Swiss-Prot record:
Protein name per UniProt: Putative ankyrin repeat protein R598
Natural source organism: Acanthamoeba polyphaga mimivirus (APMV)
PANTHER family to which the protein is assigned, alphabetical: MYOTROPHIN (PTHR24189)
SMART domains registered for this protein in UniProt: ANK (SM00248)
Signal peptide: none
UniProt-listed PROSITE patterns: ANK_REP_REGION (PS50297), ANK_REPEAT (PS50088)
Length: 304
């Protein structure tokens, strides 16, 4: 690799940041060893003679081979960093030029669609919001060049719904996104987004989510709308335990309780729950102080 002055790479990054295509092309043409048009991730590094038994190599040969490998790794690193900068800065003009020059739209294991959808992949990988540059325009360009909208286990649609970006959700669905996959443990940030989920269902998108968990969270949140929605979607009410509905009782949510009754929840399971507990103050009040059960229940509900 030719030695690359730091200021050359910096100049290229500045052109990317401004989406200055003319300056970018001039810099790239004047520095041909920086190649952003291929996909280093899919190339094999030529280790040359390093494949042969190490004892047959002379010291000078080893140093030369190590330097050659280092040069290739540095080339790949610079190329990868600069290409990622194009995505992070939403540099649509430059990205279009790179695609036209042969850069695969799925470079870097679909780095572009992954970052464009979520805007944040880690401390060093996040979208920089610049005036006149937006991720929706970037997503349109990626789709125009044939990006897989269901890449990385349906991550794009998941990220768009998660970030509450309906324009992206709509664009992805219109271009073939067909599964919303919510992994176990992530329902907490999704169960209440029923408007987006309704839109997806109306447009034939498969919802791959733990509905019973979503129902539990809806009950816990005391949300009538969400409870009804997930019951209608087929959430298994038998997965709800007696302890899960205590909050509805405590908050006097009559509508929610009736919804559960109408959908087959067995409230007599509360009797078993109470019977399994050790002696408590309520047992003493009822059995030893002769307090009326109904009166005690009214008092508890009033001041709970």
């Amino acid at each position: 690799m030719d030695d690359q002055p730091i200021n050359i790479v910096t100049d290229i990054k500045n052109a990317i940041c401004k989406d200055d295509l003319d300056s970018f092309i001039i810099l790239m043409e004047n520095n041909p060893s920086i190649n952003l048009f291929c996909e280093p991730d899919k190339q094999s590094i030529d280790f040359g003679g390093i494949i042969q038994p190490i004892e047959f190599c002379k010291n000078n040969d080893l140093i030369k081979m190590v330097n050659e490998v280092d040069d290739q790794l540095i080339d790949h690193y610079i190329s990868t960093v600069l290409r990622e900068e194009v995505i992070k800065n939403c540099s649509v003009k430059i990205l279009k030029y790179l695609f036209d020059m042969g850069l695969p739209v799925d470079f870097g294991r679909n780095f572009s669609i992954r970052l464009c959808s979520t805007k944040y992949l880690g401390s060093n990988h996040y979208i920089k919001e610049n005036p006149g540059q937006d991720t929706l325009s970037l997503l349109r360009l990626l789709i125009e060049y044939g990006v897989d909208v269901n890449a990385h286990n349906y991550l794009p649609l998941y990220s768009a719904v998660s970030s509450k970006n309906f324009d992206k959700v709509k664009l992805l669905v219109e271009n073939g996104a067909n599964v919303l996959r919510v992994a176990n443990g992530n329902e907490n940030s999704f169960y209440f987004k029923i408007d987006s989920i309704k839109y997806l269902l109306d447009n034939g998108v498969e919802i791959d989510m733990n509905l019973s968990r979503a129902l539990f969270l809806s009950i816990k949140d005391n949300s009538i709308e969400c409870i009804q929605f997930y019951l209608e979607l087929g959430a298994d009410i038998n997965k709800i335990s007696p302890m899960d509905i205590i909050g509805l009782i405590k908050l006097r949510n009559i509508v929610g309780i009736r919804l559960l009754i109408e959908n087959g929840f067995d409230f007599t399971s509360l009797n078993k729950l109470a019977g399994n507990n050790n002696e408590r103050i309520i047992d003493v009040l009822i059995n030893e102080a002769n307090v009326d059960i109904s009166a005690l229940l009214k008092i508890l509900l009033e001041f709970w």
